């Protein structure tokens, strides 16, 4: 199975440049620390979108199974793990106001998806 998980978020006002510098400095570390079954694809700035409340930045992760989400959750809880450290550090830029745009999407590759037409 192949999945892409997308986390959309908004950066606090006045923190976009610091956020970009942090991403540049930590991109390779995020890639290296990806939990088992997951591959960090990067953090992307939204150039244009029809979604108005989905966040202006997207973290994209490739997952090899549904179970990879459990492994990622466990890695995020490990106080000594590099993944947990980086994720916690990155939240300094996240606008946590409940009205701030955000999103969370799980995409499954069509090749692996169960798809059928309804009987008419």
Task: Describe each model-derived feature in a short phrase.
Residues 17-19, 69-71, 114:
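Short acidic, gly/pro-rich beta-turn/loop elements at beta-sheet edges
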Residues 1, 116-118:
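Intrinsic disorder/low-complexity detector
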Residues 25-41, 50-56, 60-110, 119-120:
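An amphipathic, aromatic/His-enriched active-site/gating alpha helix that lines ligand/cofactor pockets
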Residues 2-10, 58:
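Active-site-flanking beta-strand signature of metal-NTP-handling nucleotidyl enzymes
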């Amino acid at each position: 199975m192949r999945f892409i998980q997308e986390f959309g978020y908004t950066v606090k006002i006045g923190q976009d440049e610091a956020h970009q510098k942090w991403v540049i400095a930590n991109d390779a570390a995020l890639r290296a620390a990806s939990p088992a079954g997951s591959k960090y694809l990067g953090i992307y700035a939204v150039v244009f979108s029809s979604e108005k409340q989905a966040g202006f930045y997207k973290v994209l992760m490739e997952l090899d199974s549904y179970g990879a989400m459990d492994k990622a959750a466990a890695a995020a809880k490990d106080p000594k793990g590099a993944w947990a450290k980086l994720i916690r550090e990155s939240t300094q830029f996240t606008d946590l106001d409940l009205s701030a745009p955000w999103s969370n999407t799980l995409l499954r590759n069509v090749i692996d998806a169960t798809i059928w037409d309804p009987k008419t």
